[in-house]
Amino acid sequence: MLRFLTLLLASSACAAAEFDCMIEARQTVEIRSSVEAVIESVKVTRGSFVAKGQVIVTLESGPERAALALAQGRAETQGDIKVSEARVGITRKKWQRAEELFKQNFISANARDEAEADFKLASEELQRARETQLLARLEAQRAAEVLALRTIRSPVNGVVVEVMRKAGEFGAITFKDPIMKLAEIDPLHVEAILPASMYGKVKRGQRAVVVPEAAIGGRYEIPVSIVDPVIDAASGTLGVRLELPNRKGAIPAGVRCRVQFL
């Protein structure tokens, strides 16, 4: 009975206690170019909400567009294949006719063999024409992929935190040059640092109430998503994370809060 009361009091103390926490972006992402190029346009500004896959930056791509058009033209050309197919059809008929004439002793074996050789040569030329077109299609695909690198898309649903480069700036950018920074804010991460004595009293999936600082307001009941399995020996603390849905982006990241575990 005494043990039960002790556990009950400990549980009540855990539920009643409040702890400081911080509301942070789920992740921040620096946008860079994978190719060296000059910025043609920046499609968003600081504070803009962006969707995953949305075009946010375009790079100058004149030569790449021309290369793609040329490769597509080669890939779509059917002239060589049609000529080769026609020649295969003609030489096949000649070879078949030569076989019949040879069986009737109207032509020599050499004449029959020449007709067969012409057919085989035409077949090989048709195969080469088809292989050439396949290579042209692969080249067109490669050119399309190279051109796609000139269009930069957002890797996340989020908000633009900072824009570092502008369209038309002198000189090409490289992968070392960040263009902009995005923050993913749905869901937000609520990070709390608890005393080590709370280990075992807060569990994954447990509900908690998060209250942002007064300037923001609101009260949100959300589950614990992570309880660090290792206690920081130097500070005697334990890290806990909760995920706060933020579909409309109404709650900013970087806000202090208080959390109470239920």
Task: Report the location of each language-model feature.
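Short beta-strand-turn/beta-hairpin segments enriched in glycine/proline and small hydrophobics
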Residues: E18-S34, L138-P155, M180-L182, I226-V230
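Amphipathic alpha-helical coiled-coil/rod segments that serve as protein-protein coupling scaffolds
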Residues: A51-P155, E191
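Short, surface-exposed secondary-structure boundary micro-motifs
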Residues: V55, E60-G62, K176, E213, ...
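Structural microfeature recognizing short secondary-structure transition sites
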Residues: P187, G218-L262
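Low-complexity, intrinsically disordered
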Residues: R204-E221, G249
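Surface-exposed patches in structured soluble domains
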Residues: M22, E40-K43, F49-V55, V146, ...
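Sec-dependent signal peptide recognition
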Residues: M1-L8
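N-terminal beta-strand block that forms a small beta-sandwich/beta-barrel module immediately after a flexible targeting
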Residues: L8-V38, S225-I226, P252-A253, C257, ...
